[in-house]
């Protein structure tokens, strides 16, 4: 899977507008001015009355899934996703390029389990193939380790895909993902080209 993303300054830049309370509140206000598609039914979650789970379209074909709390006027959960065409896979995978959840315990009951529901019930159902990002934090790596395990347990397809070599290796044993003996993660630049793939259907190249 991707190159390990360990530079704290870069991580702070990615998540800064969500982590800082003032910036979070300001971004919440900006989202209210945008067109939003409520997706809580597709995701299969029941939300308390003050919460809204919506999709908003971004530039260059990207989109975001946001959990808004209208009581506190804050963003409680944010996923930025990108859809890209891959001619080798003959598919258009969706990739979560940013995933953030508030650590404010007031939202914990609502956000717990939301990541998996969005991943499998919305992203995978909508696009059939979900691919990892090219860089990941330690938390992102842990997230993908869990999701691949869930995918294998529910008879979905998991692969290691190298975008330059055009190699696709099917993975059936979650243990080799947990200990990384399948070589999904690493520190050198080439790991930017290594992706984990979860698919609803078998992929052949």
Predicted regions and their residues:
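Contiguous hydrophobic, core-forming segments of folded domains
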Residues: 115-116
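Non-catalytic substrate-recognition and accessory regions of acyl/acetyltransferase enzymes
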Residues: 1-110, 121-205
């Amino acid at each position: 899977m991707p190159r390990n993303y360990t530079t704290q300054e870069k991580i702070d830049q990615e998540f800064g507008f969500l982590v800082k309370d003032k910036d979070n509140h300001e971004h919440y206000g900006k989202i209210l001015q945008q067109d939003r598609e409520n997706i809580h039914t597709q995701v299969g979650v029941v939300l308390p009355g003050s919460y809204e789970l919506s999709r908003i379209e971004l530039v260059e074909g990207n989109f975001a899934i946001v959990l808004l709390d209208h009581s506190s006027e804050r963003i409680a959960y944010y996923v930025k996703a990108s859809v890209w065409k891959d001619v080798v896979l003959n598919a258009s995978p969706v990739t979560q390029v940013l995933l953030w959840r508030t650590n404010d315990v007031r939202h914990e009951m609502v956000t717990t389990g939301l990541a998996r529901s969005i991943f499998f019930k919305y992203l995978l159902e909508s696009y059939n193939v979900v691919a990892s990002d090219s860089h990941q934090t330690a938390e992102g790596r842990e997230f993908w380790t869990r999701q691949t395990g869930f995918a294998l347990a529910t008879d979905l397809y998991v692969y290691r895909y190298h975008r330059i070599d055009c190699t696709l290796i099917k993975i059936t044993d979650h243990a080799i993902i947990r200990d990384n003996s399948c070589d999904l993660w690493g520190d050198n630049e080439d790991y930017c080209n290594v992706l984990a793939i979860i698919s609803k259907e078998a992929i052949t190249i």
